[in-house]
Amino acid sequence: MLLSDRDIRAEFQAGRLGLDPFDDSLIQPSSVDVRLDNLFRVFNNTRYTHIDPAQRQDDLTSLVEPKEGEPFVLHPGEFVLGATLERCTLPDDLAGRLEGKSSLGRLGLLTHSTAGFIDPGFSGHITLELSNVANLPITLWPGMKIGQLCLLRLTSPAQHPYGSSQVGSKYQGQRGPTPSKSYQNFVKSN
């Protein structure tokens, strides 16, 4: 069940749902707007001949921070990692779904390529997979509204929420745009 603005406020007031920093004006009818942090991970296109999800490739991305008061410019066809300004903490019976903002999508900005789902129990900054599919550069301003977090109530609390030892929660507690850790649980079939 998708939570309404009333349900979202009740979850915040009960201390079960966390967004830090919290701004009540960001609550929408069935979501909460999230804002863009000031850190980005850009791909180093000359360090590797290809990306291999089975291998640890520490130098695949570099952390970039625009000068204060300046935007990050995302050029056509580029892909970078960003993060939400807010640290998100979900209880074991709520899951999240990150969606893009319609107004930004109409400019050619994709907020996430594939990983828009946030497991119950997750706590950390949400990594964004930002792509510019327009034919002009797009300026990304730290602090701008970048997406909306929809919250879904599970039919029962998760037995092993994200962050529990049984799940192998490699992104729990992440701060800033976190590079892929796919190599940690990559399985090759024979």
Curated annotation (Swiss-Prot):
Gene3D superfamilies named among the record's database cross-references: 2.70.40.10
Classification via CDD domains: trimeric_dUTPase
EC number per UniProt: 3.5.4.30
Known pathway: Pyrimidine metabolism; dUMP biosynthesis; dUMP from dCTP: step 1/1
Alphabetic keyword roster: Hydrolase, Nucleotide metabolism, Nucleotide-binding
Statement: the UniProt record of this protein carries the keyword Translocase: no
Pfam families: DCD (PF22769)
Positions bound to dCTP: 101-106, 119, 127-129, 148, 162, 174
Cited InterPro entries: dCTP_deaminase, dUTPase-like_sf, dUTPase_trimeric
Site positions per UniProt: Important for bifunctional activity: 116-117
GO BP annotations, alphabetical order: dUMP biosynthetic process; dUTP biosynthetic process; nucleobase-containing small molecule interconversion
Region (Disordered): 163-190
Catalytic residues identified in the record: 129
Superkingdom, natural source: Bacteria
Catalyzed reactions: dCTP + 2 H2O = dUMP + NH4(+) + diphosphate
Molecular function per GO: dCTP deaminase (dUMP-forming) activity; dCTP deaminase activity; nucleotide binding
Subunit structure: Homotrimer.
Record function comment: Bifunctional enzyme that catalyzes both the deamination of dCTP to dUTP and the hydrolysis of dUTP to dUMP without releasing the toxic dUTP intermediate.
Similarity annotation: Belongs to the dCTP deaminase family.
Protein name: dCTP deaminase, dUMP-forming
Protein encoded by which gene: dcd
